[in-house]
A protein has these predicted regions:
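Bacterial N-terminal signal peptides that target proteins for export
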Residues: 1-10
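Bacterial N-terminal signal peptides
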Residues: 9-19
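Short, surface-exposed linear segments at secondary-structure transitions and domain or protein termini
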Residues: 75-77, 96-102, 147-158
Length: 236
């Protein structure tokens, strides 16, 4: 009887120990898997967004804002008069141009502690703002005119993108509502292309090809569109 009782107690202890060990291993295993899953699910730090804004009353346009994302070709622009309804439109900026823009912003310390304005009595050229946003981090700097070469390079790119989108908007309006005026719009595009002010003129190729192939437009306009498209492809 005593022997049987002793064996029963021993078996009970072994079973309890085995169950406890399995629970610990199981808990450990699930904790490890959970941690791995959490690490895999945790999003990478969000890419930065670079924004340029210019407000220049009594000019045309009075308001320009362009936002470019570090991790995406998708960007947005808003070009209008101040009295117009606000609303951004999507467009694309290549990875190469974005890399250059963000490199310039980094050289400006992401606009932290920067004083870019020339601080001289000169004409009002419009209030310009550079803004860096990345998660909770936000920095911006405002200026009228700057002599900082790095800031000037970044400004030239942003203003070039704005002018590029303005011209594309003009071409699209003429295509829809004023086909006889298409050649004048193409001349404006050609002038800016000659001045090398358009950062990515290849963005206009689909529009130029459409004009060149559409018999509803005047021949001189179609030929100019064809020549511009050929020139841009050759330069690219």
């Amino acid at each position: 009887m005593r022997t049987s009782l002793g064996r029963l107690i021993l078996l009970t202890c072994v079973a309890a120990l085995t169950s406890s060990s399995a629970s610990v291993v199981g808990a450990s295993g699930y904790a490890s898997i959970g941690a791995d899953s959490a690490m895999r699910a945790a999003p990478a730090s969000a890419g930065a967004t670079l924004t340029f804004r210019r407000i220049f009353k009594s000019s045309s346009p009075e308001f320009i804002e362009i936002s470019v994302r570090e991790d995406s070709d998708e960007a947005s622009y808003e070009i209008r008069q101040l009295d117009d309804d606000p609303g951004a439109t999507k467009f694309e900026v290549s990875s190469g141009l974005r890399a250059r823009m963000f490199a310039l912003a980094q050289q400006l310390n992401r606009f932290q502690g920067q004083d870019l304005d020339v601080h001289r009595k000169i004409a009002n050229l419009g209030e310009k703002t550079f803004r860096w946003e990345q998660g909770p981090e936000t920095h911006e700097v405002k200026f009228n005119y700057t002599l900082n070469s790095t800031a000037s390079q970044l400004l030239q790119i942003f203003e070039g993108l704005a002018r590029q989108q303005e011209l594309l908007m003009l071409l699209e309006r003429r295509m829809k509502y004023d086909r006889l005026g298409i050649n004048d719009a193409l001349l404006q595009f050609e002038t800016e292309l000659n001045r090398k002010l358009l950062p990515e003129p290849e963005r206009a190729l689909p529009t130029l090809d459409q004009i060149a192939g559409d018999s509803r437009f005047v021949d001189i306009g179609r030929q100019r569109a064809r020549n511009l498209a050929e020139r841009i492809r050759h330069q690219s």
